Amino acid sequence: KVGNLDSMRTWSDVRDAVRAYYLLVTSNPISGEYYNIGGTHTCTVRKMLEHLISISTCKDIKVEIDPERLRPIDADLQIPDTTKFTSHTGWKPEITFEQTMEDLLNYWREQVKSGRRYLNR
């Protein structure tokens, strides 16, 4: 069950985000300044899901739109401007979208294999 598949998102790996936060706190941040961090790969939620399904060993996946997962207001496109953060810290995303999706899928394969399931939906 999914929500809006047509929303565009800029995907980033949490490992890149953690590295960004670390760089920020260790780079003498300017008090009161704000910084945007984010990935560089932009695509629809549908394309992300199609990619996950394409690298999955399970091919009979049924995708169902769940009205309860649709947001009343949903930004069609979200792209962070990381210019200021990059110039201040030298940070840029290192982990590709494809690697992130593969690692995500492998993580959940291990969860299922070990009997640990954290999603109740």
Where do the language-model regions lie?
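Glycine-rich "substrate-gating" loop/helix at the edge of Rossmann-like oxidoreductase active sites
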Residues: 4-15, 39-41, 72
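Glycine/proline-rich active-site loop of Rossmann-fold NAD(P)-dependent oxidoreductases
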Residues: 14-15, 23-36, 41-44, 59
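Generic structural signal for alpha-helix termini and adjacent loop/cap motifs
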Residues: 24-28, 55, 88, 107-114
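Amphipathic terminal alpha-helices
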Residues: 97-121
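Non-catalytic, hydrophobic alpha-helical segments
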Residues: 17, 21, 37, 48, ...
